[in-house]
């Protein structure tokens, strides 16, 4: 049996932040916002530290419900850096299927926009596994 090496994609971000710190890593088309590799590295590291201080632990599943864009990518890298398992569910699946997925996955945490937190209050049974809300 061969040994499987562990790899965290966040290590590649650190590499590119060192190699090309001022190069643009992300461009958000609808707003025009940009982030360099250095900015993305620094912001995602700061957020990762905050998630850990908030009580989230490596290996926990965390539901991410924010619109796709710079914040989504930055939070995803932060979650990888913190050792969290991002739970990404396509809202295009429809309400019934999204709720079914959440109930099945039983995430320990949730990082979301206010609307998602409001929905959590309407369907508390679906979100009962969540102990950390951001």
Language-model features and meaning:
Residues 12-36:
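AMP-dependent adenylate-forming
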Residues 81-134:
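Structural core segment of the AMP-binding/adenylate-forming
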Residues 29, 33-35, 48-93:
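Conserved AMP-binding/adenylate-forming
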Residues 1-7:
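Flexible, non-catalytic linker and terminal segments flanking ANL/adenylate-forming cores
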Residues 14, 48, 98-99:
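Short hydrophobic/charged patches on amphipathic alpha-helices used for structural packing
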